[in-house]
Amino acid sequence: MAKGKDVRVRVILECINCVRNGVNKESPGVSRYITQKNRHNTPSRLELRKFCPYCFKHTIHGEIKK
């Protein structure tokens, strides 16, 4: 039987550079990826290097709250 909360949860990763540049309106949008993480293995915030189509390069995408 499953206890309480699920071990695997869906997380949203957002480009850190697009968020910073969004204030200056240099970027036309914000890149977001949806993925899963295991709560037991990675209890802290997830950060991955992914390709951002708005920055045209690989940048750090950090986990955001839903």
Swiss-Prot record:
It is found in: Plastid, Chloroplast. Keywords: Chloroplast, Plastid, Ribonucleoprotein, Ribosomal protein. Belongs to the bacterial ribosomal protein bL33 family. GO terms for molecular function: structural constituent of ribosome. The keyword S-adenosyl-L-methionine does not apply. This is Large ribosomal subunit protein bL33c. InterPro entries: Ribosomal_bL33, Ribosomal_bL33_CS, Ribosomal_bL33_sf, Ribosomal_zn-bd. The keyword Plastid applies. It comes from Platanus occidentalis. Pfam families: Ribosomal_L33 (PF00471). GO terms for biological process: translation. GO terms for cellular component: chloroplast; ribonucleoprotein complex; ribosome.
